[in-house]
């Protein structure tokens, strides 16, 4: 079975309707804000049971933000430590993202804190929220 380089290098036809729907610029990109979730300063103040309840609220908040179309990507880092995970928000400014992060029970409790960075990435990320439910067999 052989493949030619040309078959992989072909460019798909530009879809102006899809680009507009996803908020893409002429490069197929858009502005987001990435949030690095870091271990908060107050983790040790809570019992195991309290942290479990805070985590439950954190997960519910993730679902709410995703349902509102504001949170595009969320997930933990595998090895834990100081860096706990990431969010990618469909907002253009850190101020908008900060307002969203302040709705999180884990942030409010000081179990997590956020480092916010404006990011320029593919507008195709906006399609993840349509694809992910087709791949997810279990809820968290």
Where are these regions (language model features)?
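Bacterial Sec-dependent N-terminal signal peptides
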Residues: 1-12
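Conserved, structured core segments of small domains
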Residues: 10-140
């Amino acid at each position: 079975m052989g493949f030619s380089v040309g078959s992989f290098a072909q460019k798909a036809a530009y879809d102006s309707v899809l680009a507009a729907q996803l908020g893409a610029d002429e490069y197929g990109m858009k502005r987001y804000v990435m949030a690095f979730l870091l271990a908060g300063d107050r983790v040790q103040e809570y019992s195991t049971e309290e942290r479990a309840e805070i985590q439950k609220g954190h997960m519910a908040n993730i679902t709410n933000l995703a349902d509102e179309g504001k949170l595009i990507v969320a997930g933990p880092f595998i090895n834990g430590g100081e860096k706990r995970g990431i969010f990618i928000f469909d907002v253009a400014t850190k101020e908008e993202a900060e307002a969203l992060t302040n709705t999180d029970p884990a942030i409010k409790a000081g179990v997590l804190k956020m480092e916010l960075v404006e990011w320029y990435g593919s507008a195709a990320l906006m399609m993840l929220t349509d694809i992910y439910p087709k791949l997810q067999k279990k809820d968290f």
